[in-house]
Amino acid sequence: MKRLLNCTTSEMLSMNKDELKQSILACEGRTVMTETVCAIPPLLGDLTNAELAVSFGSDMVLLNVFDCNHPTIMGLPETEQPVQLLKKLIGRPVGCNLEPIDNDATMMEDRYEISSGRHATKETFIKAKELGFDFICLTGNPGTGVSHASIEKAILLAKEYFGGLIIAGKMHSSGIDEALVDLKSIEGFIEAGADIILMPAVNTVPGLTEKELHTACQFIKSKGALSLSAIGTSQEGSDEATIREIALMNKRCGIDIQHIGDAGWCGMALPENIMTLSIAIRGKRRT
């Protein structure tokens, strides 16, 4: 199996979930994932944010606010198969966020209601598979009310009905006050079938230390899963020095995939920050 950073477009798009997972592992912490909002006009108008992200060094693209019941990616020409067309244009694995809402959880802020096509359910997992997504991310946007317990339940459903790579975890509170890096929850996610565990990047949420993330990464690796650090706190719009520091610190912790979020301009990180992240963890040759 070739490293993802050595693969051609055709090789990337022909991988099954196990091959993609192994290819990421073989990169030894040199994989960049960019999250983009696909439901608003993109930064460059007639070019999708995903295409722009890939041109600045992204290996994987995660679509946020994607509605499986009304599949639309702004910036694409009209098509009945937007995910397949996007994959053809960028030549990279593409996934989407689906949110396991916990209606019984105590919220620490007003709950933000989302459409049914964004919920993590049997129906959306089936549609995500039909649309051609390579992976799904079970997480929560701000204020939607996603808990560790609801994520674990959703993993079991996704394992049965989706079939691709499953990413699971929280970038931030999502409106619920609970530990964001919790080994018991991580173990539950992996046992339920998660392939990649998402955690906040060190320096993005208050109080999360390198030691905690390093311990979690070692635990995740021992269980045969991959780790992903997320910049999901609008710091994707910070200066390049901040991004570089986050990138190196989280690579030192043992992270396999470094994610950069969508809260820069027009539903994506500042393009320069995607490149800064990529260069920091693998140099210009691989960017």
Residue ranges, per PLM feature:
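Surface-exposed amphipathic alpha-helices with a cationic face
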Residues: 16-28, 54, 82-94, 100-102, ...
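Catalytic cores of alpha/beta
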Residues: 47-51, 176-189, 235-255
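A beta-strand-loop signature enriched in Asp, Gly, Thr, and Trp
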Residues: 200-216
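Short beta-alpha connecting loops at secondary-structure transitions
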Residues: 231, 261-263
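C-terminal helical cap(s) of enzyme catalytic domains, especially alpha/beta-barrels
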Residues: 73-84, 216, 263-287
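Histidine/acidic-residue-rich catalytic or RNA/ligand-binding cores of hydrolases
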Residues: 209-212, 239-247, 269-274
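Active-site beta->alpha loop and helix N-cap motifs at the rims of alpha/beta catalytic domains
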Residues: 1-14, 36-152, 165-183, 190-191, ...
